[in-house]
Amino acid sequence: MTKPLAQLSSDVIAGWYEGCAFSEDWSSHNFPLCAQLLRPLHTMPVKILEIGSWEGLSALFFLNYLPSCQITCVDTFAGSGEHVSDPDILAALPGLEKRFDANTKRFQSRIEKIKARSHVALIDLGLARRRFDLVYVDGGHEVRDAYGDAVLSWSLLTRKGFVIFDDYEWDKGTGVKVAVDAFCWNFINECIVVHRGYQLIVRKV
């Protein structure tokens, strides 16, 4: 059984990613906070929805730390307009989906990949009456995209479930913060903010 992150050595954590290939690491600095939040769910059959999976770094954290979880990963694997100005990211795009597939291959029985724009996937999941205990939102950073992801995923969240909004305090733009603040205001009677920092985490009441 996987131990809570606080009890894991750096070697064990590194072992989770042995043989994987990543062009970027935008997530690992958030793992201690996520582990603290998820500790009560550690052995439960949690259903997770991830919006924006890139190469699978954060998905692998959830799959390793929550050994009974199932995760649905939504991504176009084509990048977005915000990546146009970064030559390193542009260079990584052609092999993005192949790296995701290779990195997550050993978890095929616990992972569902949906290759689509997030709003399309979220509407389809809603029509299928899918529900999730945890939603991790790391999709588009424009206000419209981030707000749409928040609202559409909220309807898929179980009562007392969590939403983790990544990049809330991103220093390259305020779109996520504006969108998430608007979401929290509009859904003020339905959610409780449990953490506010680089990520903002809310729980459904």
Residue ranges and their predicted role:
Residues 1-205:
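A short alpha-helical cap/connector motif
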